[in-house]
Amino acid sequence: EMETSTQGWMVDKSNDNNQNTFLKNCEHISAIGKRALEINFNNLTKGINSELYVNTFFPEEFTRLNEQQEMMLMVYSFVGCPTVYSGQKIKTEIISKTKKNIKIKLFIKYYGEGDKLFKLDSEEFLFSENETKKIEWTIPDTLSNPITQLGYSIASDEQVSGKILINYIDISGIPKMTFKKPDHIKNDKVNTTSHNIKSLTNGVYIPDDEKYYGQLWKLAWVNDVDKWYSYGKNSFGLIKNASRGHVFTGSSDWKNYSVTSKIMFRLASSGGLVIRSQGLQRYYSLEIKSTNKLQINKMEYGLKILKEVDFSFEPFEEYFMRFEADNNFLKGFINNELLIEVEDKSNQFENGMIGCIVENGTIISDEISIN
């Protein structure tokens, strides 16, 4: 609704895309507001598409910084999570103002092998003159690689000039995906000259004498652990030498969901899963304690035990943990057995991100899943 603002959307004029593509904020009266995003294109023809996109994560141009640019721009480490995840739904309303038929696809781009962008398209939607359509697309599996762009591709089988209006685009739903180190970096020692991502990683342990690609999947997580290593199949080797450390990712919109992970405890005093995280001082946690306790905790600028039960803990054992949130009811499962549940009746956290927590030691996990 802000005049002149394009909300971060940009025209992609790279490769063989249509160079005569322009976008602007325009007046458009509808049930939801008075503005829309207008995309004008000239000389659209077969094989030459008009594309526009918005960044949803670490911008691609940052991966191409030279050393001097890095020193100027990356004074602070990049901290942020993607805004789009596999399994979520994209909903959008598009109005064609073109006198010939056009075809429109939604697409995403994710960081894959070599930190290069890989593209996934939706099905094709045909628009005739002055046609309005509401379309939906479920984001496909990106194999644990972070999504960094969301966009539209406009095509035609014949030469045409015209415009479309995007009334809205909405991202909704809980992801259905597994977070882990992507398979293409199982052996992640690779020479690269594109950029030195080591300088962009905060709290991520990478040996100084080696240069790695494929660290962008870790940048999708916010963390305050002392070290995070990912050797072999272990995606999440989290070390906090003193006090509590976390890694988390996701969106503040996520409400009712479950998180699962098989976790091994190595001399940690406590560790487990985090749900509905709204920051380092606001979250729920399911934690196994070295004192033979299982807890559901609430961190609200101070740790509060919502429920505690006895639990026979063995160090260096793997435990399959599942933590569920359904409105204000919280349930904790160990090895698929419901062992603890509680209702938070006071100032409950209604939504938030997912993650892991470790206290005074190390925990290890191959992957974390949400659905």
For the regions a language model picked out, list residue spans one by one.
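Short, surface-exposed beta-strand/strand-loop-strand elements in extracellular ectodomains
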Residues: 105-110
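Extracellular glycan-recognition regions
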Residues: 1-93, 97-100, 114-119, 124-134, ...
